[in-house]
């Protein structure tokens, strides 16, 4: 213990430790003066903690006054003991519980607020409890939400109402108190927070920072004295040297490029001197860069949607290195956009295309990055604009045409331009496709002028209107004026003549007056379109159809086409399935009216027979001399005449040895195909006759309907595989059942016999109409099979009518 100062060394197990007895140990006062070699700080604290101002004041006071003063000490909170308060909080009775940790898995603990009330808050709470009940925990939760929602800027009252789900008065009171207390508070928040280190380094010397970030310190050897500052200086020096080396390399590259440019300039001058290019013409021609063209093979687009990948083949032209070495900016001319011709100029006839050469693009107008397609040699086109100035001056704006790389564009052919339906003469199907007709709409009932019907997407019917000089006049036309001839004009095909073209149509449309236009529509020289009405099966519409049936049919009838001859029966004309269904509905309705009228007549005849039996016999004898009325004959003839395609069907009998025609009765002979018919009552007066629409089946390609007249007779008509002819003589009318007929269809004009039938029917208006009593049998027989007759129009009886 001779040395008063020593340095602590590690214990050596090989070295024996000295043993001291109690009398050899020095006293405590003697050991106080021993100082170790490792110096200790007077406070025993770290270097950062010594800078605390309370500690420095205490140390400086001790050094000045050489004694310890009570006022100059480090502030330490005093520990006080209040036994009475402690005994009130903690009772003396204590029982050890069975378990110290209680877990309630199904109950979630409510989050406790970080804010704690103070005496000032308690005063406000007592004042608020006078008007409403509010708990301390509820008040702490409100203040806590306001504090956490605010950072440097306080929340507004509207935002506070969204945060707090309380009464508006309570929210406003708490909010005003919180704002006032927050402004008076010196700290950043009312909730006490642990002080942490700031990133700007301002809290490095603050001893009250609780948590600091770990600083990465360099491990240096103490014997060489390499600290962190010297290491950072070396890194900075290395970066500066690297930057200087990079700058020198770039300067070296720049000077080398200048030298190469000087050599190339000398070579160009020598070549120009040898070529004699003193004006620079050859040099300017070489400076124009040649554009490389690429040919892209576009994969074919299949109809089934499967696009097979086709390898692209890019064919590049030979590259000239002398062209690409010097790329100079060339002033590019502005792209010219020719004005589009107006609609009036399209109507004028286009002159014949001449064999003038196409304009060639100047190569100087093309920039370096303007790529032309593979067709530029044959059909050169102007490249697309690239500058924003040109795009602004472009009349099309953002919708201007621009070339797309890899696409092939073909120039328009001058010989096919302006080939529109309005400028060319069309004939046949093309003329019907592009023609415009005078059109009438059903709902609302009005005329819209000239229009063209076409089929749009989804099956919609679209009307394309055509503007003419007479639009104001045509729209004032009464649609009822066109109803008489609209059906025939829009169904019948106009006569196709080579002299009638669209030019003549335009002449009629633009120069004719209103009466001339109407006369042209009536004579089918000008087309008129009117939509067809749908035929419904409602009872109300059936009554309207039955009332207007005669008037419509009389208007449509032009001639009756039925001929009888000695050697055969010739039937001219036919009707369509749609017209047949329309006539069938009208006939069924008229048949019902006839049946009701017949029943009324029978009741009146029975009453007259009981009162005047002799008068009934004379009336019955006069009944046989009277025949068919005019309305029934005209309606029967209209079933044949009113058809879209006029035609004639001739039915010729086989002229064999045993055939004879006695008073219009055709004798059956051999076997042949049967004529199918449909029985339907037809008359405006009760009980006159029954009209049949006969379907002739003599050839696979022929299918015609023949209107016939069947008078009811007490005798029955028996039918079998071959139709037997049954004849009923009524003065000048005979009913014939044709058998063994061969049908040939050909187009012809109405026969004289048909015109004779119309004349006879018109003269019969003066004959009084008498209802035979035997007509009920045919009507009753017709009512047994209404469904089968409505579907296919086939019946078991086949009769024809002959007027003598």
Swiss-Prot record:
Any one GO BP annotation for this protein: DNA repair
Composition skew (Polar residues), residue ranges: 654-669
Keywords: Chromatin regulator, DNA damage, DNA repair, Nucleus, Transcription, Transcription regulation
Localization: Nucleus
Region (Disordered): 372-398, 484-507, 602-623, 642-669
InterPro entries: Enhancer_polycomb, Enhancer_polycomb-like_N, Enhancer_polycomb_C
GO cellular component, as recorded: NuA4 histone acetyltransferase complex; nucleus
UniProt xrefs under PANTHER family: ENHANCER OF POLYCOMB
Role noted for this protein: May play a role in transcription or DNA repair.
Protein name per UniProt: Enhancer of polycomb homolog 2
Taxonomic placement: Eukaryota, Metazoa, Chordata, Craniata, Vertebrata
């Amino acid at each position: 213990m001779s040395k008063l100062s020593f340095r602590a060394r590690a214990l050596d197990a090989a070295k024996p430790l000295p043993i001291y007895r109690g009398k050899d140990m020095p006293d405590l006062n003697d050991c106080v003066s021993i100082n170790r070699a490792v110096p200790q700080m007077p406070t025993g604290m770290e270097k950062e903690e010594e800078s605390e101002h309370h500690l420095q004041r205490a140390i400086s006071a001790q050094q000045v006054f050489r004694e310890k003063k009570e006022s100059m000490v480090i502030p330490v909170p005093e520990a006080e003991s209040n036994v009475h308060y402690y005994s009130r909080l903690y009772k003396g009775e204590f029982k050890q519980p069975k378990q110290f940790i209680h877990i309630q898995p199904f109950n979630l603990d409510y989050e406790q607020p970080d804010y704690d009330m103070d005496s000032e808050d308690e005063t406000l709470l007592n004042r608020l409890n006078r008007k409403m009940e509010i708990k301390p925990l509820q008040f702490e939760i409100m203040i806590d939400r306001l504090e956490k929602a605010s950072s440097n800027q306080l929340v507004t009252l509207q935002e506070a109402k969204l945060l707090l789900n309380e009464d508006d008065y309570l929210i406003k009171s708490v909010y005003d108190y919180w704002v006032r207390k927050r402004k008076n508070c010196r700290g950043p928040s009312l909730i006490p927070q642990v002080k942490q280190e700031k990133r700007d380094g301002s809290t490095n010397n603050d001893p009250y920072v609780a948590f600091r970030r770990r600083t990465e310190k360099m491990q240096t050897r103490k014997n060489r004295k390499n600290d962190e500052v010297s290491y950072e200086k070396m890194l900075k020096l290395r970066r500066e040297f690297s930057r200087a080396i990079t700058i020198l390399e770039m300067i070296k590259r720049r000077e080398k490029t200048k030298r190469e440019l000087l050599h190339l300039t000398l070579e160009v001058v020598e070549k120009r001197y040898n070529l004699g290019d003193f004006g620079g013409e050859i040099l300017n021609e070489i400076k124009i860069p040649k554009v490389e063209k690429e040919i892209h093979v576009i994969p074919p687009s299949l109809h089934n949607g499967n696009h097979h990948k086709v390898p692209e083949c890019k064919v590049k032209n030979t590259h000239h290195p002398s062209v690409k070495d010097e790329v100079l900016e060339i002033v590019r001319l502005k792209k010219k956009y020719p004005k589009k011709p107006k609609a009036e100029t399209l109507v004028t006839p286009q002159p014949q295309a001449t064999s003038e050469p196409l304009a060639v693009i100047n190569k100087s107008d093309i920039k370096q990055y303007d790529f032309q397609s593979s067709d530029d040699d044959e059909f050169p086109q102007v490249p697309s604009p690239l500058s924003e100035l040109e795009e602004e001056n472009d009349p099309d704006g953002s919708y201007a045409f621009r070339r797309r790389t890899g696409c092939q564009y073909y120039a328009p052919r001058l010989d096919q331009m302006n080939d529109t339906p309005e400028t060319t003469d069309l004939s046949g199907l093309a003329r019907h496709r592009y023609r415009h007709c005078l059109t009438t709409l059903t709902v609302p009932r009005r005329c819209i002028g000239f229009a063209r019907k076409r089929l749009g997407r989804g099956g919609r019917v679209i009307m394309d209107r055509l503007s003419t000089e007479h639009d104001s006049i045509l729209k004032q036309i009464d649609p009822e004026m066109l109803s008489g001839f609209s059906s025939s004009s829009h169904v019948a095909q106009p006569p196709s003549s080579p002299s009638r073209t669209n030019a003549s149509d335009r002449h009629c449309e633009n120069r004719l007056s209103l009466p001339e236009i109407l006369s042209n529509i009536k004579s089918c020289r000008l087309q008129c379109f009117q939509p067809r009405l749908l035929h419904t099966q409602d009872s109300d519409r059936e009554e309207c159809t039955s009332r207007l049936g005669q008037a419509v049919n009389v208007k449509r009838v032009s001639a009756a086409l039925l001929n009888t001859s000695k050697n055969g029966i010739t039937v001219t004309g036919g009707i369509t399935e749609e017209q047949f269904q329309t006539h069938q509905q009208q006939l069924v309705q008229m048949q019902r009216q006839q049946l009701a009228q017949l029943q009324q007549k029978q009741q009146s005849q029975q009453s007259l027979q009981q009162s005047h039996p002799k008068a009934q016999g004379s009336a019955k004898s006069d009944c046989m001399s009277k025949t068919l009325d005019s309305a029934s004959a005209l309606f029967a003839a209209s079933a044949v005449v009113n058809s879209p395609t006029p035609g004639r069907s001739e039915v010729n009998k086989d002229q064999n040895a045993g055939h004879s025609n006695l008073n219009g009765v055709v004798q059956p002979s051999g076997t042949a195909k049967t004529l199918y018919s449909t029985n339907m009552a037809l008359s405006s007066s009760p009980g006159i006759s029954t009209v049949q629409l006969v379907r002739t089946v003599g050839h696979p390609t022929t299918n015609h309907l023949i209107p016939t007249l069947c008078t009811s007779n007490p005798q029955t008509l028996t039918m079998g595989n071959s139709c037997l002819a049954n004849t009923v003589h009524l003065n000048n009318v005979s009913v014939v059942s044709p058998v063994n007929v061969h049908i040939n269809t050909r187009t012809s004009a109405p026969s004289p016999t048909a015109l004779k039938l119309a004349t006879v029917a018109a003269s019969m208006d003066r004959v009084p109409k008498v209802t035979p009593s035997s007509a009920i049998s045919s009507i009753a027989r017709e009512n047994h099979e209404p469904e089968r007759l409505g579907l296919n129009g086939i019946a078991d009886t086949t009769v024809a009518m002959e007027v003598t």
